[in-house]
């Protein structure tokens, strides 16, 4: 009996020592308590320690056992059905669905036709008179000029008026640059135009017209002349029969010429009475100077520099050559002056008629007499005769 008691006490003592070592390591990891007295007061007795302090179960690493795999529960993915209800999968369901579709399509078509019939035949959408057509943007053209395009549309439904065709007919009028036609419910049309702006007079034979920057010839009526006082140079050398693209190119050359002359002085263009654009490589302008006219050849470039050359020497040339009629400024370092041919003396009655060869020789001689060449280059340099 004594041996058993002793053996039990030794076992308990060894267990207590192991537990105390484990508690020492555990207490080192736990942060210190605020007060040691409170800790001793809260410490349980020896019997409670023996009852609660039991050895920890061995870990899987120490025991050599493998950890059981974590089994996840798979979620069931719901199977989505189609947009159609389940009864459409059967034969009679499909027939019913097709019938409903055809019924809806027929109903939509019926509504569209009914609305179209209402819009096409209702008298409230008919153009009753010319007062139902509004015009905007016309200053040179009269309202009657624009309404002449819509003569067949009076009494017609506005939805039957071809707007694109009417706009094209308006733009065929020379003064109309751009036209827009739109419907205004219930029974009106609105016509808006942009008119062309003339930039010069155009002389075609004995008739004088206007022309814009794109080469479009504009008729000049007496009413238009009484309304405006245009102050443009007169252009020659543009035939309305040539293509519009060629006319537009020559008008761009004309505008470039005016811009170059106006860059030096605003009143230079007032001296120009006529501009000949027949040759696109030689702009010929007629200037008024000293009570008579001078024909100047400017070529097709360097207009401002060539005009300054003319303006700086014209007084000297007029003093040296009173019969000066033409000045060719196209060359780089020389100016060609041409004099007016003196009138031929009246032929005597008893004089024999000269032969054609004599007339030709006389004209050539006169031509050589009235031509003067003034060189501006240095004497050691040769003058260049290449025209620009």
Swiss-Prot record:
Q: Which InterPro entries match?
A: Cell_div_FtsQ/DivIB_C, FtsQ, FtsQ_C_sf, POTRA, POTRA_FtsQ_type
Q: Where are the transmembrane segments?
A: 95-115
GO biological process per UniProt: cell septum assembly; FtsZ-dependent cytokinesis
Protein keywords: Cell cycle, Cell division, Cell inner membrane, Cell membrane, Membrane, Transmembrane, Transmembrane helix
Q: Which residues lie on this side of the membrane: Periplasmic?
A: 116-388
POTRA domain ranges (all copies)? 128-196
GO CC, any one term: cell division site
- At the top level, the lineage of the source is Bacteria
Q: Name one Pfam family in it.
A: POTRA_1
Q: Which residues lie on this side of the membrane: Cytoplasmic?
A: 1-94
Region entry Disordered: which residue ranges? 33-67, 342-365
Q: Does the keyword RNA-binding apply?
A: no
Membrane topology type, per the record?
Single-pass type II membrane protein
Q: Where in the cell is it found?
A: Cell inner membrane
Assigned protein family: Belongs to the FtsQ/DivIB family. FtsQ subfamily.
What does the record give as the function of this protein?
Essential cell division protein.
Name the HAMAP family for this protein. FtsQ_subfam
Name of protein = Cell division protein FtsQ
């Amino acid at each position: 009996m004594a041996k058993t008691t002793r053996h039990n006490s030794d076992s308990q003592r060894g267990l207590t020592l192991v537990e105390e070592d484990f508690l020492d390591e555990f207490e080192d990891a736990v942060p210190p308590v605020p007060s040691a007295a409170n800790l001793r007061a809260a410490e349980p007795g020896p019997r409670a320690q023996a009852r609660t302090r039991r050895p920890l179960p061995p870990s899987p690493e120490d025991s050599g056992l493998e950890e059981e795999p974590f089994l996840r529960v798979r979620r069931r993915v719901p199977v989505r059905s189609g947009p159609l209800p389940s009864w459409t999968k059967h034969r009679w369901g499909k027939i019913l669905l097709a019938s409903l579709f055809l019924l809806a399509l027929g109903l939509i078509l019926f509504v569209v036709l009914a609305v179209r019939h209402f819009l096409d035949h209702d008298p409230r959408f008919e153009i009753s008179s010319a007062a139902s057509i509004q015009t905007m943007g016309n200053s040179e053209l009269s309202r009657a000029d624009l309404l002449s395009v819509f003569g067949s549309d009076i009494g017609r439904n506005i939805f039957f008026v071809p707007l694109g065709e009417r706009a094209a007919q308006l733009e065929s009028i020379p003064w109309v640059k751009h036209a827009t036609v739109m419907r205004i419910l219930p029974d009106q049309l609105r016509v808006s135009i942009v008119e062309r702006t003339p930039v010069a007079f155009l002389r075609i034979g004995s008739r004088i017209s206007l022309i814009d920057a794109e080469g479009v010839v504009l008729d000049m009526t007496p009413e238009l002349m009484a309304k405006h006082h245009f102050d443009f140079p007169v252009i020659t050398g543009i035939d309305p029969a040539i293509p519009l693209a060629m006319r537009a190119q020559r008008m761009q050359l004309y505008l470039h010429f005016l811009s170059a002359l106006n860059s030096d002085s605003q009143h230079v263009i007032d001296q120009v009475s006529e501009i000949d654009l027949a040759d696109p490589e030689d702009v010929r302008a007629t200037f008024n100077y000293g009570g008579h006219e001078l024909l100047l050849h400017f070529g097709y470039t360097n207009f401002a520099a060539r005009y300054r050359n003319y303006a700086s020497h014209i007084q000297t040339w007029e003093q040296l050559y009173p019969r000066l009629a033409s000045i060719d400024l196209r060359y780089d370092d020389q100016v060609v002056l041409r004099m007016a041919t003196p009138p031929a003396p009246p032929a005597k009655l008893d004089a024999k008629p000269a032969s054609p060869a004599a007339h030709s020789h006389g004209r050539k001689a006169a031509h050589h007499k009235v031509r003067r060449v003034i060189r501006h280059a240095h004497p050691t340099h040769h003058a260049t005769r290449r025209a620009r």
